[in-house]
A protein has these predicted regions:
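Mid-domain catalytic core of redox enzymes
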Residues: 28, 113, 250-370, 400-402
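N-terminal Rossmann-like FAD-binding beta1-loop-alpha1 element of flavoenzymes
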Residues: 30-57
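Glycine-rich active-site loop/strand segments that organize a redox cofactor
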Residues: 66-90, 156-161
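Conserved flavin/dinucleotide-binding core of flavoenzymes
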Residues: 129-130, 332-441
Length: 441
């Protein structure tokens, strides 16, 4: 869901600030210290190590991957993903990352762009099937488009691309079946922000990188096994093969600076002095980066995501997921032995009693999948600060990758990638950071 057109790319995302923060690649030919092993940090470390740089990756927690990881859940007795993520075949940065670690085959999905939906209120089901090329002839096929949507409604996509910087999705996209049955659920999922507040330009970037490029770029993909098995474990193996060092449970608590350069790190083993050619990629969450590097702007308003996993076996259908209209959940994902539900922009649900929430969602899952019988074992995960709120105000707080320190760059989906907080944005930011420090494309 994630790459945007050149017209919409920020200067940082286009790399117009030059190959390096200070211009000269040779100046930073030493060791690179990558702080934070989420996808942004992993992507930066991977590209730097592949370019022959000595890399040390520090992760404060016990495991790498950040919000994109899998773990064994004792309540369910099986491995589950921390959250549900849907990728598209046109996510260029994510696909390049997976190719670099030899893991593209770990994603699965239909052979063609296929997006099944269910309207919970009416019981109506349909499947959106964009045509392969850029010409949207699928809009004229009743078996491929949104039922009930009038042809004029599709002009909303053009208006979205011309939205002002401050416009919200709700300002730009008119009421109608296209909005209710496609654009609104896509916007809420991509931005993790209600459409009344979600920034229209950020959503336009998502559309520009997916629907606007044609159906061949919109084939939905999900991990066959788990997020860690696709994005984390192969990366750690590749980094080890390239000679990079990965230190988990290793929190960096301070960055020393002198005369416009980062000169030291402080970790659990004490102070680490940087040589003149060394550099840092600061790939922690925004609030942590602002603490380590005072004066760093970062988003300070956040939205939650709720994920619910049921221990149940269901028919995955054609795509392995289904979009829900008119309920609490936006998506239901079906994997062997586990049925998962995702609710985006979920701040409103943080205080709702778990039993009430699960009961409602189980009803939606039953309607979507045809499951019968008593509610199975479940695990509810409320991630309170899942992403920054994708509003105009928060967009203004997203920093470029470069910093006042000539040998320190930023990475993370919260930086100004030109996209909302997504896997594609996180990986893109890591690649940008590596390029700024001289890594080959």
């Amino acid at each position: 869901l994630k790459k945007r057109s050149k017209k919409l790319l920020s200067p940082q995302a286009r790399g117009s600030s030059g190959a390096r923060p200070n211009g000269s690649t040779a100046a930073f030919s030493g060791q690179v210290h990558v702080i934070g092993a989420g996808l942004a940090g992993l992507a930066a470390a991977l590209r730097l190590a592949a370019s022959g740089r000595k890399v040390t990756l520090y992760e404060a927690g016990p495991a790498c991957g950040g919000r994109c990881r899998s773990y064994f859940d004792r309540e369910l007795g099986c491995r589950i993903d921390n959250g549900n993520h849907l990728l598209l075949s046109g996510n260029d940065a994510a696909m390049a990352y997976l190719d670099a670690i030899g893991a593209r085959h770990t994603l699965g999905g239909p052979d063609a762009p296929t997006f099944p939906f269910l309207d919970l209120a009416t019981g109506e089901r349909w499947t959106v099937r964009p045509s392969p090329g850029r010409l949207p002839w699928w809009l004229f096929s009743s078996s491929r488009r949104i039922p009930g949507a009038k042809p004029a409604e599709y002009l909303a996509l053009a208006r979205l691309m011309l939205a002002s910087a401050e416009a919200t999705v709700a300002n730009v996209v008119p009421a109608g079946e296209l909005t209710r049955r496609l654009l609104e659920p896509l916007a809420v999922s991509a931005l993790n922000t209600p459409v009344a507040a979600g920034n229209a330009r950020l959503f336009a970037a998502v559309i520009a990188g997916s629907l606007a490029r044609g159906g061949a770029q919109c084939i939905p993909l999900t991990p066959r096994e788990g997020l860690s098995e696709s994005f984390v474990d192969p990366t750690l193996a590749k980094l080890a093969a390239l000679g990079a060092e990965v230190k988990t449970g290793h929190r960096i608590s301070a960055i020393g600076t002198t005369a416009g350069r980062a000169t030291s790190l402080t970790g659990p083993d004490g102070r680490i002095e940087l040589d003149s050619g060394d550099a840092i990629v600061l790939a922690t969450p925004g609030p942590v980066a602002a603490t380590l590097l005072p004066g760093t702007a970062a988003p300070d308003a956040f939205e939650a995501i709720v994920n619910l996993h049921f221990l149940a076996q269901a028919d995955p259908g054609e795509a392995g997921f289904i979009g829900l209209i008119g309920g609490l959940a936006e998506w239901v994902f079906v994997k062997p032995g586990v049925v998962s539900v995702t609710i985006s922009a979920a701040n409103r649900l943080l205080e709702q009693p778990a039993d009430d929430l699960v009961r409602t969602l189980w009803g939606e899952v039953r309607q979507a999948t045809g499951l019968v019988g008593e509610m199975p074992r479940w695990r509810l995960i409320r991630e309170k600060r899942a992403t920054f709120a994708a509003t105009f105000a928060q967009q203004q707080r997203r920093p470029r990758a470069t910093t006042p320190l000539e040998n320190l760059v930023l990475a993370g989906d919260w930086t100004d990638t030109g996209l909302p907080a997504t896997i594609e944005g996180a990986i893109r930011s890591g690649f940008t950071a590596a390029q700024l420090l001289g890594a080959a494309l």
